[in-house]
Amino acid sequence: MKYTAFARSWFLNPDQPALEGYPSLYEGDDKLPALEASLEEIGEYQRRLWANRKQALLVVIHGPDTSGKDSLIRTLATYADPAGFHAWSFGRPNASEAAHDFLWRVTPYLPAYGQMVAFNRSHHEAVIGERVWPVRDAGTYHWPARFEAIRNFERHLVSEGTCVVKIWLNLSEDEHKQRLLKRLDKPRKRWKFDRSDIEGWKQRTRYQAFAEEALAQTHTEEAPWFIV
């Protein structure tokens, strides 16, 4: 993906050079944060959120297939109080969902005050995946209006006390290919393989282009994107 300087960038590998347009958060002698300590801190804040019941947290996790969305959510869940943590996954809209406006299907799953909710894909799929695989006549889509609707929707959530954190899990072409092959080669991962994975690989270039546009259009001060 060709990056432009619209989102905050976080590199898990301190030796990885900054991508064009992004200063790395790890420079010079900076060290990676201790993962275990960071996760325990997240868990502590999540429990405080649950006890306080005055605000909510929505974590939107996006990225191509095999980018690690499920794994990230499982890790967060391990350190969270299960009473106040929920996770939901959004794939291709079904017939009922496609018959409504695109925000309709995510609205019932938004966090209540005190809750932390993680979305594996989300309303943003309506301006990324749906551009590659439309669920209705292509001529009926108006993408600028959808971008504006998402910005307004997230600003509304923030104004009402929901913190919106959006994470894009970036994946190089080579790593994407290797992870797809692992799904076939390793028995314990084979259950995750689907024919749609092949189609997703074929459409990778288009998907990445639409993703870059979507991230640029929906990155706001209130609800920024973080690229990992």
Model segments located where?
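A glycine- and Lys/Arg-enriched "phosphate-lid" helix/loop adjacent to the NTP-binding pocket
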Residues: D29, G129-E148, L157-A209
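Hydrophobic anchor at the beta1->P-loop junction of P-loop NTPases
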Residues: V59-I61
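Conserved nucleotide-sensing/catalytic segment adjacent to the nucleotide-binding pocket
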Residues: Y26-A34, A83-F147
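Charged, amphipathic alpha-helical linker segments immediately N-terminal to NTP-binding catalytic cores
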Residues: M1-L39
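Conserved lysine of the Walker
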Residues: K69
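Pre-Walker A adenine-sensing motif
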Residues: E41-A51
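Loop/turn-to-beta-strand initiation segments
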Residues: Q55-A56, H86, Y113-M116, G161-V165
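Post-Walker A alpha-helix
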Residues: L72-I73
